[in-house]
Amino acid sequence: MKVVEVKHPLIKHKIGLMREGDISTKRFRELATEVGSLLTYEATADFETEKVTIEGWNGPVEIDQIKGKKVTVVPILRAGLGMMDGVLEHVPSARISVVGVYRDEETLEPVPYFNKLASNIDERIALVVDPMLATGGSMIATLDLLKENGCKQFKVLVLVAAPEGIAALEKAHPDVELYTAAIDEKLNDKGYIIPGLGDAGDKIFGTK
């Protein structure tokens, strides 16, 4: 599995700001969007382009355009919604597929509860977004669902990943690509990433 920890100074700076314990909902939400945008820039760097001639201000001009990529952005509910706008800044024509998976706080197992996928998903590359890759269970369940519906190409974008989650994802889905702003130290006994960001969903939505 391809794992990319994006080490651009802007990303490192912004993810550092997100670690502040008493960060406001507004600021956390803004930073999640910004880091999601920067991760998308990195994740789409291998998209092929083709030459197209358009009518410019002074006659025909040849330009580069993305070549035939159909994209679906897949936020995992609910926290993934906090990264979605940042992704759409770069691929505004992408279709949105929504998958609902929550983690049982006692068993730490993923529990799927909702999905609404884009049409022709078998022809699309999926940019799957979720702020945290902790145990990997929610991401694995989402990728299982996408594959069951015919999707074949995946790029996973997360703000912070734990080594345990990376290992689990690689074992279950070695064909995906993972882009993360940070690989943290470990999971604690409750399955939270250390040092992590805290509960990203609560911080994005202002709930507890």
Curated annotation (Swiss-Prot):
Name the UniProt record assigns to this protein: Uracil phosphoribosyltransferase
Lineage: Bacteria, Pseudomonadati, Pseudomonadota, Gammaproteobacteria, Vibrionales
Function: Catalyzes the conversion of uracil and 5-phospho-alpha-D-ribose 1-diphosphate (PRPP) to UMP and diphosphate.
Keyword annotations of the record: Allosteric enzyme, Glycosyltransferase, GTP-binding, Magnesium, Nucleotide-binding, Transferase
Annotated residues for binding of 5-phospho-alpha-D-ribose 1-diphosphate: 78, 103, 130-138, 199
Pathway assigned to this chain's UniProt record: Pyrimidine metabolism; UMP biosynthesis via salvage pathway; UMP from uracil: step 1/1
Pfam families linked: UPRTase
Catalytic activity: UMP + diphosphate = 5-phospho-alpha-D-ribose 1-diphosphate + uracil
Binding site residues for uracil: 193, 198-200
Entry EC number(s): 2.4.2.9
InterPro entries xref list: PRibTrfase_dom, PRTase-like, Upp_B, UPRTase/APRTase, Ura_phspho_trans
GO molecular function, one term: GTP binding
Cofactor(s) listed: Mg(2+)
GO-annotated biological processes: UMP salvage; uracil salvage
Entry note: cofactor: Binds 1 Mg(2+) ion per subunit. The magnesium is bound as Mg-PRPP.
Keyword hit for Transport: no
Recorded family membership: Belongs to the UPRTase family.
Activity control mechanisms: Allosterically activated by GTP.
